[in-house]
Amino acid sequence: MLGSTAVMLLLLLPWTAQTRAVSGSSNPSWTQCQQLSQKLCTLAWSAHPSVGHVEPPREEADEETTDYVPHILCGDGCDPQGLKDNSQFCLQRIYQGLVFYQNLLGSDIFTGEPPLFPDGPVSQLHASLLGLSQLLQPEVHQWEPQIPSLSPNQPWQRLLLRIKILRSFQAFVAVAARVFGHGAATLTP
């Protein structure tokens, strides 16, 4: 089974420390963000590894290790009142998560053997992630988040990591899509 050290390396990505605030005082196009986030959500939820239905094993320290995976929490200002008062912190949190998952989808966990999907939806996920993150952070930035070199020894280990990452990604983009849906409905002039 994949060691807890490898899982911790995956989850300890410095996604919170290296990002900067979403630029500018103006908000993004909520309608464009809503459309892209809905597309991303659809792609993420239709993405299934080609291994059939596999339940990842539960790990004892699962709650501890998932603390480092991007989540949109109550204190992130993504609630209706928080978005109305100042949406920048929420948008920053969503941007950080998008960059985190974009880098994971480009890592050898998803590009290595065995192939994840027969038709290549990972490239569609990448394109949608890039489009949405550019709406939130249109300026070129100098930092590159680092992803630890995590190469599972066995193909089955890679498959389990993929399932775990996809589940976390699905939950993240579902909440982000709801945030952008609310923003498009209530914050668009």
From Swiss-Prot:
Where mainly found? secreted
An annotated Gene Ontology molecular function: cytokine activity
Q: Where in the cell is it found?
A: Secreted
Q: Which family does it belong to?
A: Belongs to the IL-6 superfamily.
Which Pfam families does the UniProt record give? IL23
Q: Which InterPro entries match?
A: 4_helix_cytokine-like_core, IL-23_alpha
- SUPFAM superfamilies of this UniProt entry? 4-helical cytokines
One cellular component term from this protein's GO annotations in UniProt: interleukin-23 complex
Residue pairs linked by disulfide bridges in the UniProt entry: none
Provide a GO biological process annotation. tissue remodeling
Q: How does it assemble?
A: Heterodimer with IL12B; disulfide-linked. The heterodimer is known as interleukin IL-23. Interacts with IL23R; this interaction enables recruitment of IL12RB1.
Quote the Gene3D superfamilies the UniProt record gives.
1.20.1250.10
Q: What start-end ranges are recorded for coiled-coil regions in this protein?
A: none
User: Does this entry carry the keyword DNA damage?
Assistant: no
Sorted keywords for this record are: Antiviral defense, Cytokine, Disulfide bond, Immunity, Inflammatory response, Innate immunity, Secreted, Signal, Tissue remodeling
Any idea what job this protein has? Answer: Associates with IL12B to form the pro-inflammatory cytokine IL-23 that plays different roles in innate and adaptive immunity. Released by antigen-presenting cells such as dendritic cells or macrophages, binds to a heterodimeric receptor complex composed of IL12RB1 and IL23R to activate JAK2 and TYK2 which then phosphorylate the receptor to form a docking site leading to the phosphorylation of STAT3 and STAT4. This process leads to activation of several pathways including p38 MAPK or NF-kappa-B and promotes the production of pro-inflammatory cytokines such as interleukin-17A/IL17A.
Q: Could you identify this protein by its name?
A: Interleukin-23 subunit alpha
Signal peptide, first to last residue: 1-19
